[in-house]
Amino acid sequence: MSSWMFNRHGKPVVIYDGTNIRDPRGRLIAWINGSNVYSLQARHIGWFDSGVVYDSKNKALVFLSNATGHLPYRPAMSGTPGLPGLSGIPGRPGLPGAPGRPGFSGWSDEDALTYLSK
């Protein structure tokens, strides 16, 4: 089941499709492997924990509406647009191990769509 993920302002910005992260047009932008998030170029870029995506500094980037993971605060969420058709998934590259994870921090200063698309 696909769901919108919200940024620190409560705006829906990316889509979680159950195994990966997609842009608002339904195109794949990041892999999720266990609790790790990888770019399409197989670089470790963050963590996925209890419905929250954290950046490489372990700062909250986006979250699902039913997330139970650590958030600095839960913003009011705006309405969500309809979900687009989802594109096919290309072959997944070999993914390297993940670095050590720092302690939880605040909200990320990164723009979620830009950060996850790199």
Question: Where does each model-flagged region fall?
Answer:
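Long terminal segments
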Residues: M1-K11, S50-K118
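Well-ordered beta-strand segments characteristic of repetitive beta-sheet solenoids
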Residues: M5, N20-R22, N36-Y38, V53-Y54
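N-terminal leader/targeting segments and the first structural element of proteins
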Residues: M1-A30
